[in-house]
Amino acid sequence: MEPGLEHALRRTPSWSSLGGSEHQEMSFLEQENSSSWPSPAVTSSSERIRGKRRAKALRWTRQKSVEEGEPPGQGEGPRSRPAAESTGLEATFPKTTPLAQADPAGVGTPPTGWDCLPSDCTASAAGSSTDDVELATEFPATEAWECELEGLLEERPALCLSPQAPFPKLGWDDELRKPGAQIYMRFMQEHTCYDAMATSSKLVIFDTMLEIKKAFFALVANGVRAAPLWDSKKQSFVGMLTITDFILVLHRYYRSPLVQIYEIEQHKIETWREIYLQGCFKPLVSISPNDSLFEAVYTLIKNRIHRLPVLDPVSGNVLHILTHKRLLKFLHIFGSLLPRPSFLYRTIQDLGIGTFRDLAVVLETAPILTALDIFVDRRVSALPVVNECGQVVGLYSRFDVIHLAAQQTYNHLDMSVGEALRQRTLCLEGVLSCQPHESLGEVIDRIAREQVHRLVLVDETQHLLGVVSLSDILQALVLSPAGIDALGA
């Protein structure tokens, strides 16, 4: 490992600060084959100060050069960059031209050593944020926090099962054979997860001995949708606690004649995992900071998960959580510096990108419990809410469900979905739509600009035609040019 990256990786906080002195740092890759723990990495205060000053100067120099239209230099790649200390500043991105307006006369192929986003492995000062609601304040280490359960569900609507689709992929195969079709694929292959990590970020981590109720309240209080789970007995990360787990708890016990919901609240995360998984524990899906962003996209879509922990290969610490939104944001920012593929001018209808068959929807008059049933049975992340005429009037996502905990209303699941949307105290994504005649470039620009996870495809009368998700777009831009169909796998 080269000195710059090794120094950066060593700047992660020690787990002794989260769970006591017995939580020694260890190699996540060696945890199954070794009975002894590696020694914790130690860095002197003078080294930390020098690293902080160098990182600050480099970040602003790099930022200025990109804003002036110059891509980051070859010598600023992830393997040569000094460690970035936490500064309490938000991650900054260069000003870019939207993909829909980008000049097709390219800038040439991207340099392989672009240093696009600096990374900071430590927790930043209060109030800083880098990835909207997904980065949160760090909780005190007194009770240590608990983690996940299952392998987080995929961002897109239900898998297409019908043999007929309103919008077949008429010209997608031909587009992939045209020059420049693989430019985004190569761009993601040439950049590592370290490049997309935030300058300053915070992680909420739960110990598996934490009570379920406290864990879900912690998610709400910090505005995050998932948290890594640390098992102090195994001295390793064992999964992620997600909003999906909260939905499963409500769905399983709301109408149970034997168990009251308040009894489940007192269960520890460890107990809930044992009950639900019944001993079939799956390994935590993770990635290394040295792995390519192409591999990150494939791992997210292939495993139908929403969040991908980036683990330090030496200590096993969580450095960052990659998401579909983060990856598309990274690609969108620097995509305007690349030659423009011709398929960005094609319409959604022509390319057939999205889900158009067997759509999961919910009536606005249906109870919340019905929406939970659909979330569990169909494994979808959001439901278009329609009225009796079939017109889209809202969008009810899994993240809306967690606010039942914040409002102490999870014992009233007979409330209608429409009423639940009207009572939302936090303005979330809302309903953003697109139409079949819009180009793929326009759709990508809108998703990136509005920072949403999906667009609802409607006609002129607001009747539902389909859903275009982040997974659909990343599959089309990055994986399809490589001949990989992770969505259908």
Curated annotation (Swiss-Prot):
AMP 1 binds at residues 240-245, 285, 306-307. AMP 3 binds at residues 306, 355, 360, 381-382, 453, 469-472. InterPro entries: AMPK_gamma/SDS23_families, CBS_dom, CBS_dom_sf. The keyword Phosphoprotein applies. Skeletal muscle, with weak expression in heart and pancreas. Phosphorylated by ULK1; leading to negatively regulate AMPK activity and suggesting the existence of a regulatory feedback loop between ULK1 and AMPK. A motif (AMPK pseudosubstrate) lies at residues 293-314. ADP 1 binds at residues 240-245, 285, 306-307. CDD domains: CBS_euAMPK_gamma-like_repeat1, CBS_euAMPK_gamma-like_repeat2. One of its GO terms (cellular component) is cytosol. ADP 2 binds at residues 225, 325, 397-400, 424, 432, 453-454. AMPK is a heterotrimer of an alpha catalytic subunit (PRKAA1 or PRKAA2), a beta (PRKAB1 or PRKAB2) and a gamma non-catalytic subunits (PRKAG1, PRKAG2 or PRKAG3). Interacts with FNIP1 and FNIP2. Belongs to the 5'-AMP-activated protein kinase gamma subunit family. This is 5'-AMP-activated protein kinase subunit gamma-3. It comes from Homo sapiens.
